[in-house]
UniProtKB/Swiss-Prot annotation:
One of its GO terms (cellular component) is nucleus. The keyword Coiled coil applies. The keyword Coiled coil applies. Keywords: Coiled coil, Phosphoprotein. It comes from Homo sapiens (Human). The modification Phosphothreonine is found at residue 227. This is Coiled-coil domain-containing protein 82. InterPro entries: CCDC82 (IPR025244), DUF4211 (IPR025451). It comes from the Eukaryota. Residues 1-14 have a biased composition (Basic residues). The gene is CCDC82. The modification Phosphoserine is found at residues 88, 131, 154, 195, 219, 329. Residues 39-67, 273-294 have a biased composition (Acidic residues). Residues 88-108 have a biased composition (Polar residues). Residues 229-256 form a coiled coil.
Length: 544
Protein backbone atom coordinates (compact mmCIF):
# COMPACT_ATOMS: atom_id res chain seq x y z
CA UNK A 1 0.00 0.00 0.00
CA UNK A 2 1.27 3.43 -0.94
CA UNK A 3 0.33 6.19 1.47
CA UNK A 4 -0.21 9.50 -0.12
CA UNK A 5 0.15 12.50 2.05
CA UNK A 6 -2.48 15.03 1.57
CA UNK A 7 -1.80 18.68 2.04
CA UNK A 8 -3.88 20.33 4.60
CA UNK A 9 -6.49 22.68 3.27
CA UNK A 10 -9.37 24.58 4.74
CA UNK A 11 -11.65 21.77 3.85
CA UNK A 12 -9.47 19.04 5.40
CA UNK A 13 -8.75 20.55 8.82
CA UNK A 14 -11.53 22.45 10.47
CA UNK A 15 -9.73 22.75 13.81
CA UNK A 16 -6.84 24.80 12.49
CA UNK A 17 -8.06 28.19 11.35
CA UNK A 18 -5.32 30.28 9.77
CA UNK A 19 -5.00 33.84 10.88
CA UNK A 20 -5.98 36.36 8.31
CA UNK A 21 -3.63 39.13 7.49
CA UNK A 22 -4.57 42.48 8.89
CA UNK A 23 -5.09 44.94 6.14
CA UNK A 24 -5.02 47.84 8.68
CA UNK A 25 -1.50 46.92 9.88
CA UNK A 26 -0.38 46.71 6.34
CA UNK A 27 -1.67 50.22 5.71
CA UNK A 28 -0.04 51.44 8.90
CA UNK A 29 3.33 50.18 7.81
CA UNK A 30 2.76 51.69 4.44
CA UNK A 31 1.93 55.02 5.87
CA UNK A 32 4.80 55.51 8.36
CA UNK A 33 4.25 59.14 8.96
CA UNK A 34 1.35 61.46 8.65
CA UNK A 35 3.62 64.19 7.36
CA UNK A 36 4.21 62.32 4.12
CA UNK A 37 0.49 62.27 3.58
CA UNK A 38 0.25 66.05 4.01
CA UNK A 39 2.98 66.76 1.46
CA UNK A 40 1.14 66.07 -1.68
CA UNK A 41 -2.39 65.08 -2.30
CA UNK A 42 -1.43 63.56 -5.55
CA UNK A 43 0.93 61.14 -3.95
CA UNK A 44 -1.79 60.06 -1.54
CA UNK A 45 -4.23 59.61 -4.35
CA UNK A 46 -1.78 57.59 -6.37
CA UNK A 47 -0.85 55.49 -3.39
CA UNK A 48 -4.46 54.98 -2.51
CA UNK A 49 -5.23 53.93 -6.06
CA UNK A 50 -2.33 51.48 -5.99
CA UNK A 51 -3.45 50.14 -2.66
CA UNK A 52 -6.95 49.59 -4.01
CA UNK A 53 -5.60 47.67 -6.94
CA UNK A 54 -3.48 45.55 -4.69
CA UNK A 55 -6.43 44.90 -2.42
CA UNK A 56 -8.53 43.88 -5.35
CA UNK A 57 -5.83 41.60 -6.64
CA UNK A 58 -5.31 40.03 -3.22
CA UNK A 59 -9.00 39.55 -2.71
CA UNK A 60 -9.47 38.08 -6.16
CA UNK A 61 -6.59 35.73 -5.43
CA UNK A 62 -8.19 34.64 -2.15
CA UNK A 63 -11.56 34.28 -3.81
CA UNK A 64 -10.02 32.05 -6.45
CA UNK A 65 -8.47 29.93 -3.75
CA UNK A 66 -11.81 29.65 -1.97
CA UNK A 67 -13.55 28.66 -5.21
CA UNK A 68 -10.97 25.97 -5.91
CA UNK A 69 -11.10 24.60 -2.42
CA UNK A 70 -14.85 24.64 -1.81
CA UNK A 71 -16.23 23.28 -5.15
CA UNK A 72 -19.68 23.84 -3.70
CA UNK A 73 -22.33 26.43 -3.72
CA UNK A 74 -19.65 29.25 -3.23
CA UNK A 75 -18.75 28.98 -6.90
CA UNK A 76 -22.01 30.65 -7.89
CA UNK A 77 -21.12 34.08 -6.41
CA UNK A 78 -22.23 37.15 -8.27
CA UNK A 79 -20.61 40.56 -8.85
CA UNK A 80 -22.91 42.03 -6.16
CA UNK A 81 -21.03 40.16 -3.43
CA UNK A 82 -17.73 41.52 -4.71
CA UNK A 83 -19.08 45.07 -4.47
CA UNK A 84 -20.09 44.48 -0.83
CA UNK A 85 -16.55 43.37 -0.05
CA UNK A 86 -15.13 46.50 -1.64
CA UNK A 87 -17.46 48.68 0.43
CA UNK A 88 -16.44 46.92 3.62
CA UNK A 89 -12.79 47.44 2.72
CA UNK A 90 -13.34 51.11 2.06
CA UNK A 91 -15.14 51.58 5.37
CA UNK A 92 -12.31 49.82 7.18
CA UNK A 93 -9.86 52.13 5.46
CA UNK A 94 -11.93 55.13 6.53
CA UNK A 95 -11.85 53.96 10.12
CA UNK A 96 -8.10 53.48 9.95
CA UNK A 97 -7.66 56.89 8.50
CA UNK A 98 -9.81 58.37 11.26
CA UNK A 99 -7.57 56.77 13.83
CA UNK A 100 -4.53 58.10 12.12
CA UNK A 101 -6.01 61.55 11.86
CA UNK A 102 -6.91 61.58 15.53
CA UNK A 103 -3.33 60.82 16.41
CA UNK A 104 -2.05 63.73 14.27
CA UNK A 105 -2.34 67.42 14.55
CA UNK A 106 -5.56 69.38 14.43
CA UNK A 107 -4.75 71.16 11.17
CA UNK A 108 -3.88 68.07 9.43
CA UNK A 109 -7.05 66.53 10.77
CA UNK A 110 -9.25 68.97 8.92
CA UNK A 111 -7.35 68.51 5.70
CA UNK A 112 -7.55 64.82 6.14
CA UNK A 113 -11.30 64.93 6.69
CA UNK A 114 -11.77 66.95 3.54
CA UNK A 115 -9.70 64.51 1.57
CA UNK A 116 -11.67 61.62 3.03
CA UNK A 117 -14.92 63.32 2.04
CA UNK A 118 -13.68 63.80 -1.50
CA UNK A 119 -12.51 60.28 -1.50
CA UNK A 120 -15.88 58.98 -0.31
CA UNK A 121 -17.62 60.97 -3.01
CA UNK A 122 -15.26 59.53 -5.59
CA UNK A 123 -15.87 56.06 -4.25
CA UNK A 124 -19.65 56.54 -4.44
CA UNK A 125 -19.30 57.75 -8.01
CA UNK A 126 -17.18 54.74 -8.81
CA UNK A 127 -19.77 52.45 -7.18
CA UNK A 128 -22.55 54.02 -9.23
CA UNK A 129 -20.47 53.69 -12.35
CA UNK A 130 -19.67 50.08 -11.52
CA UNK A 131 -23.32 49.30 -10.77
CA UNK A 132 -24.36 50.83 -14.10
CA UNK A 133 -21.69 48.81 -15.88
CA UNK A 134 -22.86 45.68 -14.10
CA UNK A 135 -26.45 46.38 -15.10
CA UNK A 136 -25.37 46.97 -18.69
CA UNK A 137 -23.37 43.77 -18.62
CA UNK A 138 -26.32 41.85 -17.18
CA UNK A 139 -28.62 43.29 -19.82
CA UNK A 140 -26.15 42.48 -22.58
CA UNK A 141 -25.63 38.96 -21.28
CA UNK A 142 -29.41 38.50 -20.94
CA UNK A 143 -29.96 39.74 -24.49
CA UNK A 144 -27.17 37.50 -25.76
CA UNK A 145 -28.67 34.50 -23.95
CA UNK A 146 -32.13 35.33 -25.28
CA UNK A 147 -30.77 35.75 -28.79
CA UNK A 148 -28.96 32.43 -28.51
CA UNK A 149 -32.11 30.75 -27.26
CA UNK A 150 -34.19 32.32 -30.01
CA UNK A 151 -31.66 31.26 -32.61
CA UNK A 152 -31.58 27.75 -31.19
CA UNK A 153 -35.37 27.57 -31.11
CA UNK A 154 -35.67 28.99 -34.61
CA UNK A 155 -33.16 26.44 -35.86
CA UNK A 156 -35.11 23.62 -34.16
CA UNK A 157 -38.36 24.95 -35.64
CA UNK A 158 -36.80 25.11 -39.07
CA UNK A 159 -35.52 21.56 -38.70
CA UNK A 160 -38.93 20.37 -37.56
CA UNK A 161 -40.65 22.21 -40.40
CA UNK A 162 -38.24 20.70 -42.87
CA UNK A 163 -38.81 17.22 -41.45
CA UNK A 164 -42.59 17.64 -41.42
CA UNK A 165 -42.49 19.05 -44.94
CA UNK A 166 -40.49 16.08 -46.11
CA UNK A 167 -42.90 13.68 -44.36
CA UNK A 168 -45.92 15.43 -45.88
CA UNK A 169 -44.32 15.35 -49.32
CA UNK A 170 -43.56 11.65 -48.89
CA UNK A 171 -47.15 10.99 -47.79
CA UNK A 172 -48.52 12.94 -50.72
CA UNK A 173 -46.29 11.07 -53.12
CA UNK A 174 -47.40 7.75 -51.63
CA UNK A 175 -51.06 8.78 -51.86
CA UNK A 176 -50.63 9.79 -55.47
CA UNK A 177 -49.02 6.49 -56.27
CA UNK A 178 -51.66 4.41 -54.48
CA UNK A 179 -54.64 6.02 -56.14
CA UNK A 180 -53.40 5.42 -59.66
CA UNK A 181 -56.14 7.43 -61.37
CA UNK A 182 -55.69 8.99 -64.76
CA UNK A 183 -56.61 12.40 -63.34
CA UNK A 184 -53.60 12.30 -61.03
CA UNK A 185 -51.27 11.40 -63.90
CA UNK A 186 -50.52 14.99 -64.93
CA UNK A 187 -49.55 16.11 -61.42
CA UNK A 188 -47.27 13.13 -60.90
CA UNK A 189 -45.62 13.70 -64.24
CA UNK A 190 -45.01 17.37 -63.44
CA UNK A 191 -43.25 16.39 -60.24
CA UNK A 192 -41.11 13.92 -62.12
CA UNK A 193 -40.19 16.55 -64.73
CA UNK A 194 -39.19 19.11 -62.10
CA UNK A 195 -36.86 16.68 -60.34
CA UNK A 196 -33.42 16.44 -61.91
CA UNK A 197 -32.51 13.06 -60.45
CA UNK A 198 -35.43 10.90 -61.59
CA UNK A 199 -36.40 10.72 -65.24
CA UNK A 200 -38.67 7.66 -64.91
CA UNK A 201 -41.61 7.56 -62.54
CA UNK A 202 -42.66 4.14 -61.27
CA UNK A 203 -46.08 3.76 -59.68
CA UNK A 204 -46.43 1.42 -56.71
CA UNK A 205 -49.66 -0.52 -56.72
CA UNK A 206 -51.08 -3.62 -55.08
CA UNK A 207 -49.72 -7.11 -55.45
CA UNK A 208 -52.28 -8.22 -58.00
CA UNK A 209 -52.06 -5.12 -60.17
CA UNK A 210 -49.32 -4.71 -62.78
CA UNK A 211 -46.72 -2.02 -62.36
CA UNK A 212 -47.28 1.07 -64.42
CA UNK A 213 -44.32 2.98 -65.83
CA UNK A 214 -44.82 6.49 -67.18
CA UNK A 215 -41.83 7.75 -69.12
CA UNK A 216 -42.75 11.03 -70.78
CA UNK A 217 -45.69 13.24 -71.51
CA UNK A 218 -45.51 12.17 -75.13
CA UNK A 219 -46.05 8.54 -74.15
CA UNK A 220 -49.25 9.43 -72.25
CA UNK A 221 -50.53 11.30 -75.28
CA UNK A 222 -49.79 8.28 -77.46
CA UNK A 223 -51.66 6.02 -75.04
CA UNK A 224 -54.66 8.35 -75.11
CA UNK A 225 -54.58 8.30 -78.89
CA UNK A 226 -54.38 4.50 -78.97
CA UNK A 227 -57.31 3.93 -76.63
CA UNK A 228 -59.97 5.56 -78.88
CA UNK A 229 -58.60 3.61 -81.82
CA UNK A 230 -58.99 0.37 -79.86
CA UNK A 231 -62.53 1.27 -78.81
CA UNK A 232 -63.45 2.07 -82.41
CA UNK A 233 -62.05 -1.26 -83.56
CA UNK A 234 -63.97 -3.10 -80.84
CA UNK A 235 -67.18 -1.32 -81.81
CA UNK A 236 -66.66 -2.27 -85.46
CA UNK A 237 -66.17 -5.90 -84.48
CA UNK A 238 -69.32 -5.90 -82.36
CA UNK A 239 -71.30 -4.37 -85.23
CA UNK A 240 -69.98 -6.97 -87.64
CA UNK A 241 -70.91 -9.79 -85.28
CA UNK A 242 -74.43 -8.41 -84.93
CA UNK A 243 -74.75 -8.07 -88.69
CA UNK A 244 -73.54 -11.63 -89.18
CA UNK A 245 -76.21 -12.92 -86.83
CA UNK A 246 -78.85 -10.82 -88.57
CA UNK A 247 -77.82 -12.06 -92.02
CA UNK A 248 -78.03 -15.66 -90.78
CA UNK A 249 -81.50 -15.08 -89.42
CA UNK A 250 -82.69 -13.45 -92.64
CA UNK A 251 -81.27 -16.21 -94.79
CA UNK A 252 -83.07 -18.76 -92.63
CA UNK A 253 -86.31 -16.79 -92.92
CA UNK A 254 -85.97 -16.73 -96.72
CA UNK A 255 -85.44 -20.48 -96.83
CA UNK A 256 -88.36 -21.19 -94.50
CA UNK A 257 -90.82 -18.60 -95.88
CA UNK A 258 -92.70 -21.01 -98.21
CA UNK A 259 -92.51 -24.09 -96.00
CA UNK A 260 -94.03 -25.40 -92.84
CA UNK A 261 -92.24 -24.71 -89.52
CA UNK A 262 -91.41 -28.30 -88.62
CA UNK A 263 -90.45 -29.34 -92.15
CA UNK A 264 -88.13 -26.36 -92.44
CA UNK A 265 -86.43 -27.31 -89.17
CA UNK A 266 -85.79 -30.82 -90.46
CA UNK A 267 -84.59 -29.74 -93.89
CA UNK A 268 -82.23 -27.00 -92.65
CA UNK A 269 -78.67 -28.40 -92.68
CA UNK A 270 -75.43 -27.01 -91.15
CA UNK A 271 -73.62 -26.98 -94.50
CA UNK A 272 -75.62 -23.99 -95.72
CA UNK A 273 -74.81 -22.16 -92.49
CA UNK A 274 -71.11 -22.81 -93.01
CA UNK A 275 -71.30 -21.47 -96.58
CA UNK A 276 -73.05 -18.36 -95.30
CA UNK A 277 -70.37 -17.88 -92.66
CA UNK A 278 -67.60 -18.13 -95.29
CA UNK A 279 -69.35 -15.59 -97.51
CA UNK A 280 -69.81 -13.24 -94.56
CA UNK A 281 -66.12 -13.54 -93.63
CA UNK A 282 -65.19 -12.54 -97.18
CA UNK A 283 -67.52 -9.58 -96.94
CA UNK A 284 -65.98 -8.66 -93.58
CA UNK A 285 -62.47 -8.66 -95.07
CA UNK A 286 -63.53 -6.52 -98.01
CA UNK A 287 -65.56 -4.00 -95.97
CA UNK A 288 -63.40 -3.85 -92.83
CA UNK A 289 -62.23 -0.26 -93.42
CA UNK A 290 -65.65 1.19 -94.21
CA UNK A 291 -68.05 2.88 -91.82
CA UNK A 292 -71.16 1.06 -93.09
CA UNK A 293 -71.28 -2.71 -93.62
CA UNK A 294 -72.92 -4.26 -96.72
CA UNK A 295 -73.84 -7.91 -96.25
CA UNK A 296 -76.23 -9.98 -98.39
CA UNK A 297 -77.16 -7.00 -100.60
CA UNK A 298 -78.49 -4.74 -97.85
CA UNK A 299 -77.06 -1.75 -95.97
CA UNK A 300 -77.52 -1.58 -92.21
CA UNK A 301 -76.89 1.48 -90.08
CA UNK A 302 -76.03 1.23 -86.41
CA UNK A 303 -79.45 2.00 -84.93
CA UNK A 304 -81.37 0.04 -87.54
CA UNK A 305 -79.18 -2.99 -86.96
CA UNK A 306 -79.86 -2.85 -83.21
CA UNK A 307 -83.63 -2.56 -83.71
CA UNK A 308 -83.74 -5.41 -86.22
CA UNK A 309 -81.61 -7.52 -83.92
CA UNK A 310 -84.11 -6.97 -81.12
CA UNK A 311 -86.99 -7.91 -83.42
CA UNK A 312 -85.19 -11.08 -84.48
CA UNK A 313 -84.59 -11.98 -80.84
CA UNK A 314 -88.33 -11.56 -80.20
CA UNK A 315 -89.11 -13.83 -83.15
CA UNK A 316 -86.65 -16.38 -81.80
CA UNK A 317 -88.42 -16.35 -78.46
CA UNK A 318 -91.82 -16.89 -80.04
CA UNK A 319 -90.56 -19.80 -82.15
CA UNK A 320 -88.94 -21.38 -79.11
CA UNK A 321 -92.18 -21.00 -77.18
CA UNK A 322 -94.11 -22.68 -79.98
CA UNK A 323 -91.61 -25.50 -79.97
CA UNK A 324 -92.06 -25.93 -76.22
CA UNK A 325 -95.84 -25.97 -76.65
CA UNK A 326 -95.59 -28.69 -79.23
CA UNK A 327 -93.25 -30.73 -77.09
CA UNK A 328 -95.39 -30.27 -73.99
CA UNK A 329 -98.93 -31.34 -74.75
CA UNK A 330 -100.39 -29.47 -71.77
CA UNK A 331 -100.04 -26.10 -73.53
CA UNK A 332 -101.50 -25.08 -76.87
CA UNK A 333 -102.81 -21.97 -78.62
CA UNK A 334 -105.45 -23.83 -80.65
CA UNK A 335 -109.11 -23.32 -79.83
CA UNK A 336 -111.24 -25.94 -78.11
CA UNK A 337 -113.11 -27.01 -81.19
CA UNK A 338 -109.86 -27.72 -83.09
CA UNK A 339 -108.70 -29.92 -80.23
CA UNK A 340 -112.02 -31.72 -80.24
CA UNK A 341 -111.81 -32.40 -83.98
CA UNK A 342 -108.33 -33.92 -83.55
CA UNK A 343 -109.64 -36.11 -80.72
CA UNK A 344 -112.47 -37.35 -82.91
CA UNK A 345 -110.04 -38.15 -85.73
CA UNK A 346 -107.75 -40.05 -83.33
CA UNK A 347 -110.68 -42.06 -82.01
CA UNK A 348 -111.79 -42.88 -85.56
CA UNK A 349 -108.30 -44.15 -86.43
CA UNK A 350 -108.21 -46.25 -83.25
CA UNK A 351 -111.64 -47.68 -84.11
CA UNK A 352 -110.13 -49.03 -87.33
CA UNK A 353 -106.67 -49.76 -85.85
CA UNK A 354 -106.82 -50.65 -82.14
CA UNK A 355 -103.06 -50.19 -81.63
CA UNK A 356 -103.01 -46.54 -82.71
CA UNK A 357 -103.62 -44.89 -79.32
CA UNK A 358 -101.13 -47.22 -77.61
CA UNK A 359 -98.34 -46.31 -80.03
CA UNK A 360 -99.33 -42.66 -79.77
CA UNK A 361 -99.01 -42.55 -75.98
CA UNK A 362 -95.80 -44.57 -75.77
CA UNK A 363 -94.04 -42.21 -78.25
CA UNK A 364 -93.62 -44.59 -81.16
CA UNK A 365 -95.28 -42.22 -83.59
CA UNK A 366 -93.24 -39.03 -84.06
CA UNK A 367 -94.91 -37.40 -87.04
CA UNK A 368 -96.44 -33.96 -86.77
CA UNK A 369 -100.07 -35.07 -87.06
CA UNK A 370 -99.51 -37.72 -84.35
CA UNK A 371 -98.01 -35.12 -82.01
CA UNK A 372 -100.91 -32.79 -82.64
CA UNK A 373 -103.40 -35.55 -81.83
CA UNK A 374 -101.52 -36.42 -78.63
CA UNK A 375 -101.57 -32.79 -77.59
CA UNK A 376 -105.31 -32.56 -78.16
CA UNK A 377 -105.97 -35.77 -76.19
CA UNK A 378 -103.97 -34.43 -73.24
CA UNK A 379 -105.77 -31.14 -73.58
CA UNK A 380 -109.18 -32.86 -73.39
CA UNK A 381 -108.27 -35.01 -70.40
CA UNK A 382 -106.14 -32.61 -68.35
CA UNK A 383 -107.54 -29.19 -69.27
CA UNK A 384 -111.21 -29.84 -69.98
CA UNK A 385 -112.37 -32.75 -67.83
CA UNK A 386 -109.99 -33.32 -64.91
CA UNK A 387 -110.26 -29.86 -63.26
CA UNK A 388 -114.06 -30.14 -63.20
CA UNK A 389 -113.93 -33.60 -61.68
CA UNK A 390 -111.60 -32.41 -58.94
CA UNK A 391 -113.84 -29.45 -58.12
CA UNK A 392 -116.90 -31.70 -57.90
CA UNK A 393 -115.20 -34.10 -55.51
CA UNK A 394 -113.56 -31.41 -53.39
CA UNK A 395 -116.90 -29.71 -52.67
CA UNK A 396 -118.53 -32.97 -51.57
CA UNK A 397 -118.16 -35.50 -48.79
CA UNK A 398 -118.07 -38.52 -51.01
CA UNK A 399 -116.49 -41.65 -49.71
CA UNK A 400 -113.45 -42.88 -51.61
CA UNK A 401 -115.12 -46.23 -52.23
CA UNK A 402 -118.14 -44.63 -53.86
CA UNK A 403 -115.94 -42.40 -56.09
CA UNK A 404 -113.96 -45.43 -57.30
CA UNK A 405 -117.17 -47.26 -58.15
CA UNK A 406 -118.43 -44.35 -60.23
CA UNK A 407 -115.09 -44.14 -62.10
CA UNK A 408 -114.77 -47.88 -62.83
CA UNK A 409 -118.25 -48.57 -64.14
CA UNK A 410 -118.93 -47.07 -67.52
CA UNK A 411 -122.75 -47.14 -67.33
CA UNK A 412 -124.99 -45.37 -64.79
CA UNK A 413 -128.74 -45.12 -64.30
CA UNK A 414 -130.45 -43.07 -61.57
CA UNK A 415 -134.02 -43.90 -60.52
CA UNK A 416 -136.57 -42.49 -58.08
CA UNK A 417 -137.70 -44.70 -55.28
CA UNK A 418 -139.68 -44.53 -52.12
CA UNK A 419 -138.08 -41.96 -49.84
CA UNK A 420 -136.25 -43.26 -46.82
CA UNK A 421 -134.94 -41.38 -43.82
CA UNK A 422 -131.48 -42.93 -43.75
CA UNK A 423 -127.82 -42.12 -44.26
CA UNK A 424 -126.63 -41.44 -47.80
CA UNK A 425 -124.32 -44.18 -49.07
CA UNK A 426 -122.32 -41.64 -51.10
CA UNK A 427 -121.46 -39.04 -48.45
CA UNK A 428 -122.45 -40.80 -45.21
CA UNK A 429 -124.72 -38.01 -44.00
CA UNK A 430 -128.20 -38.63 -42.62
CA UNK A 431 -130.54 -37.73 -45.45
CA UNK A 432 -134.02 -38.07 -46.75
CA UNK A 433 -132.94 -40.41 -49.58
CA UNK A 434 -135.21 -41.00 -52.54
CA UNK A 435 -132.76 -41.91 -55.36
CA UNK A 436 -131.06 -45.15 -56.28
CA UNK A 437 -127.89 -45.20 -58.41
CA UNK A 438 -127.26 -48.30 -60.61
CA UNK A 439 -123.67 -48.74 -61.84
CA UNK A 440 -122.72 -51.27 -64.53
CA UNK A 441 -120.58 -51.70 -67.64
CA UNK A 442 -117.13 -52.91 -68.61
CA UNK A 443 -113.85 -51.75 -67.15
CA UNK A 444 -111.55 -50.07 -69.70
CA UNK A 445 -108.20 -48.29 -70.06
CA UNK A 446 -108.69 -44.52 -70.10
CA UNK A 447 -105.83 -44.01 -72.62
CA UNK A 448 -106.00 -46.86 -75.10
CA UNK A 449 -109.75 -47.49 -74.69
CA UNK A 450 -109.18 -51.22 -74.46
CA UNK A 451 -111.98 -53.07 -72.63
CA UNK A 452 -111.34 -55.40 -69.71
CA UNK A 453 -113.96 -58.19 -69.68
CA UNK A 454 -113.36 -59.14 -66.05
CA UNK A 455 -116.73 -59.15 -64.26
CA UNK A 456 -118.35 -57.35 -67.14
CA UNK A 457 -121.88 -58.12 -65.90
CA UNK A 458 -121.31 -56.85 -62.36
CA UNK A 459 -123.72 -54.21 -61.01
CA UNK A 460 -123.69 -51.85 -58.00
CA UNK A 461 -126.72 -50.11 -56.43
CA UNK A 462 -126.48 -47.18 -53.98
CA UNK A 463 -129.16 -45.23 -52.13
CA UNK A 464 -128.34 -41.54 -52.16
CA UNK A 465 -129.88 -38.18 -51.59
CA UNK A 466 -130.95 -35.65 -54.16
CA UNK A 467 -127.66 -33.64 -54.23
CA UNK A 468 -125.45 -36.70 -54.42
CA UNK A 469 -127.60 -38.15 -57.21
CA UNK A 470 -127.27 -35.06 -59.40
CA UNK A 471 -123.54 -34.83 -58.61
CA UNK A 472 -123.11 -38.48 -59.59
CA UNK A 473 -124.85 -37.89 -62.91
CA UNK A 474 -122.55 -34.97 -63.91
CA UNK A 475 -119.39 -36.66 -62.61
CA UNK A 476 -120.08 -39.89 -64.51
CA UNK A 477 -120.86 -38.11 -67.79
CA UNK A 478 -117.63 -36.08 -67.70
CA UNK A 479 -115.51 -39.03 -66.57
CA UNK A 480 -116.71 -41.40 -69.29
CA UNK A 481 -117.37 -38.87 -72.08
CA UNK A 482 -114.33 -39.90 -74.14
CA UNK A 483 -115.19 -43.60 -73.83
CA UNK A 484 -118.76 -42.97 -74.93
CA UNK A 485 -117.50 -40.89 -77.86
CA UNK A 486 -115.12 -43.71 -78.79
CA UNK A 487 -117.97 -46.23 -78.78
CA UNK A 488 -119.95 -44.05 -81.16
CA UNK A 489 -116.89 -43.67 -83.41
CA UNK A 490 -116.56 -47.45 -83.48
CA UNK A 491 -120.16 -47.89 -84.59
CA UNK A 492 -119.74 -45.26 -87.35
CA UNK A 493 -116.52 -46.87 -88.53
CA UNK A 494 -118.15 -50.30 -88.68
CA UNK A 495 -120.96 -48.98 -90.86
CA UNK A 496 -118.81 -46.80 -93.14
CA UNK A 497 -115.93 -49.21 -93.59
CA UNK A 498 -115.19 -50.25 -97.18
CA UNK A 499 -113.05 -53.18 -98.25
CA UNK A 500 -109.72 -52.60 -99.99
CA UNK A 501 -109.52 -49.04 -98.65
CA UNK A 502 -106.65 -47.65 -96.64
CA UNK A 503 -107.24 -46.55 -93.06
CA UNK A 504 -106.19 -42.99 -93.80
CA UNK A 505 -108.67 -42.62 -96.65
CA UNK A 506 -111.48 -44.18 -94.62
CA UNK A 507 -110.83 -41.88 -91.68
CA UNK A 508 -110.75 -38.80 -93.91
CA UNK A 509 -114.00 -39.79 -95.56
CA UNK A 510 -115.83 -40.54 -92.29
CA UNK A 511 -114.50 -37.40 -90.64
CA UNK A 512 -115.51 -35.21 -93.58
CA UNK A 513 -119.03 -36.71 -93.62
CA UNK A 514 -119.40 -36.36 -89.82
CA UNK A 515 -118.35 -32.76 -90.08
CA UNK A 516 -120.81 -32.10 -92.88
CA UNK A 517 -123.82 -33.61 -91.14
CA UNK A 518 -123.02 -31.74 -87.87
CA UNK A 519 -122.34 -34.77 -85.73
CA UNK A 520 -118.97 -33.39 -84.49
CA UNK A 521 -120.56 -30.05 -83.55
CA UNK A 522 -123.32 -31.89 -81.74
CA UNK A 523 -120.86 -33.84 -79.63
CA UNK A 524 -118.81 -30.71 -78.94
CA UNK A 525 -121.98 -28.91 -77.73
CA UNK A 526 -122.75 -31.84 -75.46
CA UNK A 527 -119.25 -31.59 -73.93
CA UNK A 528 -119.66 -27.87 -73.32
CA UNK A 529 -122.99 -28.52 -71.61
CA UNK A 530 -121.41 -31.02 -69.23
CA UNK A 531 -118.58 -28.61 -68.48
CA UNK A 532 -121.02 -25.82 -67.71
CA UNK A 533 -123.04 -28.09 -65.41
CA UNK A 534 -119.87 -28.92 -63.49
CA UNK A 535 -118.83 -25.27 -63.25
CA UNK A 536 -122.16 -24.00 -61.92
CA UNK A 537 -123.05 -26.95 -59.70
CA UNK A 538 -124.57 -25.72 -56.43
CA UNK A 539 -123.20 -26.48 -53.01
CA UNK A 540 -124.59 -29.35 -51.05
CA UNK A 541 -127.44 -28.36 -48.73
CA UNK A 542 -128.97 -30.23 -45.85
CA UNK A 543 -132.59 -31.16 -46.35
CA UNK A 544 -134.89 -30.52 -43.46
Amino acid sequence: MIHVRRHETRRNSKSHVPEQKSRVDWRRTKRSSISQLLDSDEELDSEEFDSDEELDSDESFENDEELDSNKGPDCNKTPGSERELNLSKIQSEGNDSKCLINSGNGSTYEEETNKIKHRNIDLQDQEKHLSQEDNDLNKQTGQIIEDDQEKHLSQEDNDLNKQTGQIIEDDLEEEDIKRGKRKRLSSVMCDSDESDDSDILVRKVGVKRPRRVVEDEGSSVEMEQKTPEKTLAAQKREKLQKLKELSKQRSRQRRSSGRDFEDSEKESCPSSDEVDEEEEEDNYESDEDGDDYIIDDFVVQDEEGDEENKNQQGEKLTTSQLKLVKQNSLYSFSDHYTHFERVVKALLINALDESFLGTLYDGTRQKSYAKDMLTSLHYLDNRFVQPRLESLVSRSRWKEQYKERVENYSNVSIHLKNPENCSCQACGLHRYCKYSVHLSGELYNTRTMQIDNFMSHDKQVFTVGRICASRTRIYHKLKHFKFKLYQECCTIAMTEEVEDEQVKETVERIFRRSKENGWIKEKYGQLEEYLNFADYFQEEKFEL
